[in-house]
């Protein structure tokens, strides 16, 4: 029986089409150019390389260039989220109907995650925030992130369901025995890599209730 739901935040609890992640992604590139002196025409290549080898741009910059991770996170998330997000009453209603405990499991900082959930009007549904600081910068899909989260939850892996728009983030959850859901939303930035680890595939976050 599923007792706990782990929700990814970005491009999962709101759609990729909102445009919020585009601005954050631009700010990641801007940080590399203006703060680290990376040539503008090489940023995309370096970020793809970090994505493949380390999972995220932050993880790559942290390991290879020893950046101040907190300064980076502050810079890239200094975005007015209300510009992109509005209260989502169907999401609010669906979350209210689901009896399971709910947490956010995100590679973003909790301070930003709270602002996002507040803008969506759904903050009250979430009991815990497993954010990049909780993960000690070992972001998804690093297996240690999942071990940390599971150790903090009052649930076994087989009682957890995890939802993420980045399919490869589901692999470690699946290996631990969680039920996994890939949100294959329009505008998915990462393609289908890892989709074989998804027990279910949904097109919008509103389909979660149907699975449960
Ligand atoms: Mg996401």
What is each residue range found by the language model?
Residues 1-3, 96, 103, 109-212:
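Asp-based, Mg2+/Mn2+-dependent phosphohydrolase catalytic module
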Residues 2-7, 12-92, 111:
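N-terminal helical cap/lid subdomain that shapes the substrate entry/recognition surface
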Residues 83, 102-104:
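Short helix-to-loop capping/linker segments positioned immediately adjacent to catalytic or ligand/cofactor-binding
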Residues 90-100:
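A short, Lys/Arg-enriched amphipathic alpha-helix followed by its capping loop at the start of a domain
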